[in-house]
């Protein structure tokens, strides 16, 4: 599966929950319907909070005093929250949001001084890249709910999500060039989300773009007033959660698989996926329900 390939590319070891039944229920140590995730015994600080209910997992970047910087500890917390029970049928969609007026300011520059050393710097950027790849390879859609500033790796996080809803007060930038650190890793996601010349202007100047500009260029999916942001992101998530997990997972994987291909190969892959979709229990259930003029009953 794509999630397997994504982790293997980084030499990651599989956590024990992926070696168990793929439909195992959520463990008590993470979250349960309507409950928040308790702090674990790990020595590393938990810089995210999570909550899951009705198939929707909310992951909140919870370090507003540090502008929700994607420090190594934050990245590890986020990675853990994304990976947890990724194959569980209880999970249909993930929303990533943040506390405070800044969605994320990107990497913590205090971790990037010469005193930290090359090995530490390598771990920071490899972990960040792994998180972005996990979002792409995850079987369920991941929605960014942005209220405020998203810069550098924070902008990269938004660009990496499948869907992004932002408040009209949000803005986006890749300002690393201003401090002598070009946003090369954010450019990977940004350059795949917006036109090349738009991406390069953002990268070369470091100047921010507004939420409306981000919408126009395709960095985000929708702009809403701040007071409607949570409602709109939740509405989208609930709609996704009401659908067949297996059908959506196949569709997401196929979309990203065909995207870099030439037209002929893309249609070949998509045609195969359509046939595979018809072999799914929910594929036949949906068609039969339509013919019988009733609501489909999804297996998960």
Swiss-Prot record:
Matches recorded under Pfam families: ECH_1
Region (Disordered): 32-54
Gene3D superfamilies: 2-enoyl-CoA Hydratase, Chain A, domain 1, Lyase 2-enoyl-coa Hydratase, Chain A, domain 2
GO molecular function, one term: hydro-lyase activity
Residues modified to N6-succinyllysine: 110
Protein name as it appears in the record: Enoyl-CoA hydratase domain-containing protein 3, mitochondrial
Native species: Rattus norvegicus
Transit peptide residues according to the UniProt entry: 1-66
GO biological process, one term: positive regulation of cellular response to insulin stimulus
Superkingdom of the organism of origin: Eukaryota
UniProt function note: May play a role in fatty acid biosynthesis and insulin sensitivity.
Swiss-Prot/TrEMBL keywords: Fatty acid metabolism, Lipid metabolism, Mitochondrion, Transit peptide
Annotated GO CC locations: mitochondrion
Family that this chain belongs to: Belongs to the enoyl-CoA hydratase/isomerase family.
InterPro entries: ClpP/crotonase-like_dom_sf, Enoyl-CoA_hydra/iso, Enoyl-CoA_hydra_C, Mitochondrial_ECH-domain
Cell compartments where the protein resides: Mitochondrion
């Amino acid at each position: 599966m794509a999630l397997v390939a994504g982790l293997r590319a980084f030499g990651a070891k599989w956590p024990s929950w992926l070696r168990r039944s793929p439909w195992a229920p959520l463990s008590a140590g993470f979250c349960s319907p309507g409950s928040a995730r308790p702090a674990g015994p790990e020595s590393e600080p938990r810089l995210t909070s999570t909550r899951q209910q009705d198939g929707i997992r909310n992951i909140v970047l919870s370090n507003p005093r540090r502008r929700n910087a994607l420090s190594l500890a934050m990245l590890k917390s986020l990675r853990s929250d994304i990976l947890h029970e990724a194959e569980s049928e209880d999970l249909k969609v993930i929303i990533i949001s943040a506390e405070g007026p800044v969605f994320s300011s990107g990497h913590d520059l205090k971790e990037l001084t010469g005193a930290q050393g090359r090995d530490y710097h390598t771990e920071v950027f490899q972990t960040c890249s792994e998180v972005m790849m996990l979002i792409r390879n995850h079987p369920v859609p991941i929605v960014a709910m942005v209220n405020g500033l998203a810069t550098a790796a924070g902008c990269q996080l938004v660009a990496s999500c499948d869907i992004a809803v932002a408040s009209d007060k949000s803005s986006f930038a890749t300002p690393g060039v201003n401090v002598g650190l070009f946003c090369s890793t954010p450019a990977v996601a940004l350059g795949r989300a917006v036109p090349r010349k738009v991406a390069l202007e953002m990268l070369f100047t470091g100047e921010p773009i507004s939420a409306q500009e981000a919408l126009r260029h395709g960095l985000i999916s929708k702009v809403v007033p701040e007071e409607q942001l949570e409602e709109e992101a939740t509405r989208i998530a609930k709609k996704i959660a009401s659908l067949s997990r297996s059908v959506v997972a196949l569709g997401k994987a196929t979309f990203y698989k065909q995207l870099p291909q030439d037209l002929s190969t893309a249609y070949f892959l998509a045609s195969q996926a359509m046939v595979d979709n018809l072999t799914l229990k929910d594929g036949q259930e949906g068609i039969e329900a339509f013919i019988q003029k009733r609501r489909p009953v999804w297996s998960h």
